[in-house]
Structures are given as C-alpha cells and as structure tokens.
C-alpha cells in the first residue's frame, strides 16, 4: 500500500514538472499594462517566473498609447487598461479576444503633495479653493485628452464645478506616472493620481481623496489579444485572477473585482 501511494505521489510530481516545463518551452509572455500597474506587475512577473519558469515582459504606458499600439500590430499577448474606454477601443478594432475580457481591479482617485510639503489634508467638494491650494503652482495630471487618470480627473472636477478654474492651471503628463513624477520632483505642488500610485511612491503623500460619486468607477479590464490565446498566455491570465496576484495587487492599493 505504501508503495502504491508513493508511486501516485511520484506520478503527480512528474505531471506538475512536465506541465511547468511545457509552459517554459513556449517562451515569454508580453503584457501591455497601464502605467499605474508598474510596481504590482513587476512583482507578479517575478513571482510567476519563480513558480512557472516563464518570463513575463511588460510594457507600461498610458492605456491610450497601448491600445493604439496593439491596434497597429504590436506583439502583445495581454492588455490591461486603466479604464473601460480604451479596452472598448481595442475591442472595436477587433484586436481583443472578447471572450477573455474581464474587469480585474479597481482603484481610487487622490490628490498628492510632495512628501516634505507643509500641505495639510483637505476635503474635496464644490467649495474647495484650488487656487489657494496651488498657490501659483500647477496641478499635475495625466493628459485629460487621452490618459485615463486625467479623464477621471476632468470628469470629477467638472462635476464639482472646478474644471473651468483649473484647466488653465494643469501640468499635463503623458501618463499617470508622469504626473506622479512631477510631484515627486517638487515641480508641481499637487497632483491627481491613483491611490495605488501614492502607495508605490516614497516621495509623495495623499492629502485628499475624490468622492467616489464624482467620477466613473476606476476599473482595470484585462483581456487576451486576438490570436494570442495559447496555453502559456492563458496560464498567466488565470494567474492574474488568482490569490497570489491578488495579494500583490492589494499590497499596492488596488481593489480586487
């Protein structure tokens, strides 16, 4: 009996080893992910490599930039957008395997100041005196024309009646991490970023959080790029929805959907 169980365990171990080698043999996975996912995705890629032996290479930028690159045929296997709009765009261009689309994460929209700033916490509402808070400086934000964080920010500021006052005072960046960097370098007294960006940065502090009802929910849809739904990509896609990845995402301030 003991020999029988030993043989079963040995067979199971061999099966797992063969499965792991099969994934490794299929090569690396390329992920196009919103800039705000940089730290979390790097940690997840490292963990996946340890567990499965497969390299995950990520390209981080504004979701708009990534969606257009995928449309143009860039060699991405997975796309994670920081909003539904740019995933919709990729779907409309028939660049996405729509059966794999799923909302993976949520986030918050916050205002940050340099870590050493004397700026105190404040409440964001229709009476917020942004001109006084900026004190002659500019408000760092992802470009509201195409960057999801900037689009969320514009929507919130419009709803709160502050957009007309603030639009001439913006310092637009190519993506949300660019806006974060302006505040980290003390080139802007305040910036609008995601809560997860503030968690990932040692150079800023959160001084205010936008009311949830002031903007659409911050959501991160994930999907496999059309024609790339092989076993290795599917394994990482499933891993992103699993407990190991969830723990890392939560550590960086994301909410799990």
Swiss-Prot record:
UniProt source species: Escherichia coli (strain K12)
Protein name (record): Molybdate-binding protein ModA
One term of GO molecular function: molybdate ion binding
CDD domains noted in UniProt: PBP2_EcModA (cd13536)
Signal peptide extent: 1-24
Principal subcellular localisation of the protein: periplasm
Function: Part of the ABC transporter complex ModABC involved in the transport of molybdenum into the cell. Binds molybdate with high affinity in vitro and with a similar affinity in vivo. Binds tungstate with high affinity in vitro. Binds unnatural anion perrhenate with high affinity in vitro. Does not bind sulfate, phosphate, arsenate, selenate, chlorate, metavanadate, nitrate, perchlorate, permanganate or carbonate.
Effect ascribed to mutating residue 36 to A: Loss of chromate removal from a buffered solution
InterPro entries: ModA, ModA/WtpA
UniProt entry keywords in alphabetical sequence: Chromate resistance, Metal-binding, Molybdenum, Periplasm, Signal, Transport, Tungsten
């Amino acid at each position: 009996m003991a020999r029988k169980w030993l043989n079963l365990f040995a067979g199971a171990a061999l099966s797992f080893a063969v499965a792991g080698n099969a994934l490794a043999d299929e090569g690396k996975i390329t992920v196009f992910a919103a800039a705000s996912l940089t730290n979390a995705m790097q940690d997840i890629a490292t963990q996946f490599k340890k567990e499965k032996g497969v390299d995950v290479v990520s390209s981080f930028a504004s979701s708009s930039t990534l969606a257009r690159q995928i449309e143009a045929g860039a060699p991405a296997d997975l796309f994670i957008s920081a909003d539904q709009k740019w995933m919709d765009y990729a779907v409309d261009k028939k660049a996405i395997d729509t059966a794999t689309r799923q909302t993976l994460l949520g986030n918050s929209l916050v205002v940050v100041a340099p870590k050493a700033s004397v700026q105190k916490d404040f409440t964001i509402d229709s009476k917020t005196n942004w001109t006084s808070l900026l004190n002659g400086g500019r408000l760092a934000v992802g470009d509201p024309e195409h960057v999801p964080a900037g689009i969320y920010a514009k929507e919130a500021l419009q709803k709160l009646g502050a957009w007309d006052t603030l639009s001439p005072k913006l310092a637009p960046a190519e993506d949300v991490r660019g806006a974060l960097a302006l505040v980290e370098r003390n080139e802007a007294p305040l910036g609008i970023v995601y809560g997860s960006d503030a968690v990932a940065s040692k150079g800023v502090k959160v001084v205010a959080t936008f009311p949830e009802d002031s903007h659409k929910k911050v959501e991160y849809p994930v999907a496999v790029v059309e024609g790339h739904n092989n076993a290795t990509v599917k394994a990482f896609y499933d891993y992103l929805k699993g407990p190991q990845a969830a723990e890392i995402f939560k550590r960086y301030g994301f909410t799990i959907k």
